[in-house]
């Protein structure tokens, strides 16, 4: 394949991914809270520079405070940790295209894609940080270095490999880097240099805006997650830098504000939940938070004026728990790791915005633990924590830390269909939690076919977990394992699961609307009683591949903060066998009617406690990732799951008792008695009654 054909092939793949999620505004399962937006401020914006973060009118005062106290706003850490490393680094040459022989398989070209955007992230960090340091320190040598980076980036071909249409992650970073250089160094460019950078910015800006307004029509297709992110990461900083210099800058800012005021967040409701899961909450929040900060600093507008922003820090607090790995849902580049440091910074940001002390606790927990954050690609390829500290301290103040409750609790995000049970939330070795998902967004975009799925963590280990690895969007592990119901803690009916296809799976006849039509709903919950409960209805989720299904609901009770009871009820118009799945990274010990997941420090006993146990035909331990190319998990641990087969029936009513215990020490003692629809459960001598 020639280089030009390879470039075109990647552009076609990129466009296919870009237009994923289709025009689905008629199917949006939530109503976005709308806010009026007043654009009159555009008529009075200052021409002074800088504008990005520190304002021209405030620059002298900021310099004086830093000179008097280098630790002011953690500026000294910003220099030491984020800027000095670029003092002797020469500006990078333009990246090369992916090797032609890789373009036919995502798992082959994804490493080159990732390395390219990581390099562009380094270029952005260098350009921005050296620009700030040079101006604040009044250091001509640093200013010269920052100029060199800015001018080098301006030579990158805007239609080449760092264009939005080839690698948008690289494109966003390149344009943002130049925007910082153009703004902070403006007075230090010659007229010719300034024009070169300005023209490069405008060319790239217009490409992105054409994509938003024409290719994906974002205002009518608000679910296009990369389109959304291009506003915060590229459009807003660039238009602030170009304001008064480019006649369309104001128009583009108005477009961005209309999107945020009227159409955002399409993935989250007023409850603060986020349908795409905590990793994509993380990336969206990171770029959005910075963009809103830059708008606050330059334009004086408060974009955090929706109920969603008041509550959304609760989502990672409860659904990406501090102490667990593999315990949440949707696409996750961090799968297999504890919640990352950027998540901590994002929740701290909302601590500043909303003065919520529990968020500071979460931040402090992650900050203390993640001492090697700089070694992980999803950090160094994306974030700069020294800059984050500087920005936060210039604009916000955080309250004093306060730990969340250690009592048994259930937090529900009913609009987006997420829930989380917790007990002893602040004690790592005692913490028990279950994260549950039944989302009306179905499997669209970065969501999966996993409505009514759960994970269970106890005593330091996620025993019932999500399995597999992250290799990038569209690789085998993504399209043949992670997106599908058979990789989740869920049932299959006649061997079939929920609709989890997308354009990358190459499923014949796929339409993106099928993904949302396969949504579920949290239909009932009780957060107040001693026994906490949540119920999800995932009937529609299975309908595409199991048209005979008439109803499928899963109900979970949390008893005394120690054990879980789960009921799966399904009715079908024809008899179908049912395969009840539970996945783990640990060892399974199977028996005729039960099984145990055995971790290093804890275990989970799973027993089927009603008459459904008589319908079990087999309990099997299975290893592997189905049809995933073994190349993608070479030298990585192969995970396991249990398949419990129930004989064919028109009705399935599976009642399961899940009891986590430590491997050593005192054990939770549980007994039960089932009479009709009443379950009497005795846990460590205390009796509780559940009406099924």
Task: Kindly label every feature range from the protein language model.
Residues 470-692:
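CBM-like, beta-strand-rich accessory domains located in the C-terminal region of large
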Residues 48, 170, 174, 231, ...:
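Residues that flank catalytic or metal-binding motifs in active/ligand-binding sites
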Residues 72-75, 113-326, 332-333:
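Aromatic-lined, polymer-binding surfaces characteristic
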Residues 58, 423-425, 438-442, 491, ...:
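Short, flexible loop/turn elements at secondary-structure junctions
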Residues 2-76:
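Mature N-terminal, pre-catalytic/accessory segment of carbohydrate-active enzymes
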Residues 60-124, 136:
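N-terminal carbohydrate-binding/catalytic regions of secreted carbohydrate-active enzymes
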Residues 216-219, 242, 280-463, 525-527, ...:
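Carbohydrate-active enzyme catalytic cores, enriched for enzymes
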Residues 464-469:
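Catalytic Cys-His active-site segments of thiol-dependent hydrolases/isopeptidases
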């Amino acid at each position: 394949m020639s280089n030009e054909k390879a470039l075109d092939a990647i552009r076609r793949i990129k466009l296919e991914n870009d237009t994923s999620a289709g025009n689905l505004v008629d199917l949006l399962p939530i109503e976005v809270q709308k806010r009026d937006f007043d654009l009159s401020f555009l008529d009075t914006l200052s021409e002074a520079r800088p504008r990005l973060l520190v304002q021209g009118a405030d620059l002298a005062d900021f310099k004086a405070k830093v000179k008097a106290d280098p630790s002011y706003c953690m500026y000294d850490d910003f220099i030491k940790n984020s800027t000095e490393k670029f003092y002797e680094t020469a500006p990078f040459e333009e990246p090369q295209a992916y090797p032609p022989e890789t373009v036919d398989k995502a798992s082959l070209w994804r490493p080159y894609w990732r390395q390219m955007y990581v390099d562009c992230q380094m270029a952005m960090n260098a350009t921005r940080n050296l620009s700030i340091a040079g101006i604040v320190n009044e250091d001509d040598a640093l200013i010269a270095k920052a100029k060199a980076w800015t001018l080098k980036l301006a030579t990158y071909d805007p239609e080449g490999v760092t264009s939005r249409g080839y690698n948008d992650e690289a494109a966003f970073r390149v344009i943002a880097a130049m925007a910082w250089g153009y703004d902070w160094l403006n007075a230090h460019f010659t007229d010719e240099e300034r024009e070169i950078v300005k023209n490069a910015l405008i060319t790239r800006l217009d490409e992105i805006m054409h994509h938003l307004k024409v290719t994906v029509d974002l205002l009518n297709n608000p679910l296009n997650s990369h389109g959304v992110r291009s506003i915060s990461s590229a459009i807003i900083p660039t238009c602030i830098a170009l304001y008064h210099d480019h006649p369309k800058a104001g128009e583009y800012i108005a477009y961005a504000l209309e999107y945020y005021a009227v159409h955002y967040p399409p993935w989250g409701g007023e409850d603060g939940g986020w349908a795409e899961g905590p990793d994509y909450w993380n990336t969206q929040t990171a770029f959005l938070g910075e963009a809103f900060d830059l708008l606050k600093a330059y334009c004086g507008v408060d974009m955090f004026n929706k109920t969603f922003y008041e509550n959304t820090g609760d989502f990672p607090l409860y659904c990406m728990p501090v102490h667990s790995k593999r315990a949440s849902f949707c696409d996750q580049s961090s799968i297999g790791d504890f919640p990352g440091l950027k998540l901590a910074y994002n929740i701290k940001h909302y601590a500043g915005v909303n003065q919520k002390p529990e968020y500071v606790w979460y931040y402090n927990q992650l900050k203390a633990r993640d001492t090697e954050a700089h070694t992980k690609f999803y950090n160094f390829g994306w974030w700069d924590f020294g800059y984050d500290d500087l920005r936060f301290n210039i604009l916000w103040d955080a309250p004093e830390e306060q730990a969340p409750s250690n009592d048994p609790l259930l937090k529900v995000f009913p609009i987006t269909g997420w829930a989380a049970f917790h007990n002893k939330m602040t004690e790592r070795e005692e913490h028990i939690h279950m994260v549950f998902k039944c989302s009306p967004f179905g499997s669209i975009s970065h969501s999966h076919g996993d409505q009514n799925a759960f994970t269970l963590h106890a005593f330091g280990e996620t025993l019932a977990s999500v399995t597999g690895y992250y290799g990038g969007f569209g690789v085998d592990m993504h399209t043949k394992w992670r997106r599908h119901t058979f990789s989740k803690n869920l049932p299959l009916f006649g061997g079939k699961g929920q609709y989890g296809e997308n354009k990358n799976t190459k499923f014949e006849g796929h339409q993106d609307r099928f993904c949302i039509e396969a949504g579920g709903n949290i239909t009932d919950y009780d957060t107040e009683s001693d026994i906490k409960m949540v119920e999800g209805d995932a009937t529609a989720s299975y309908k595409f591949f199991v048209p005979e299904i008439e109803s499928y609901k899963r109900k979970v009770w949390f008893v005394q903060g120690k054990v879980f009871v789960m009921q799966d009820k399904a009715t079908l118009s024809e008899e179908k066998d049912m395969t009840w799945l539970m996945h783990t990274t640990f060892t399974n010990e199977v028996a005729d009617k039960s099984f145990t997941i055995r971790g290093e420090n804890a275990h989970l006993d799973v027993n089927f406690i009603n008459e459904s146990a008589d319908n079990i035909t087999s309990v099997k331990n299975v290893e592997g990732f189905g049809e995933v190319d073994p190349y993608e998990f070479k030298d990585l641990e192969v995970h396991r799951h249990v398949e419990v087969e129930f004989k064919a029936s028109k009705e399935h009513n599976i009642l399961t008792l899940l009891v986590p215990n430590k491997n050593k020490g005192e054990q939770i003692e549980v007994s039960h008695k089932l009479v009709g629809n009443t379950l009497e459960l005795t846990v460590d001598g205390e009796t509780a009654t559940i009406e099924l």
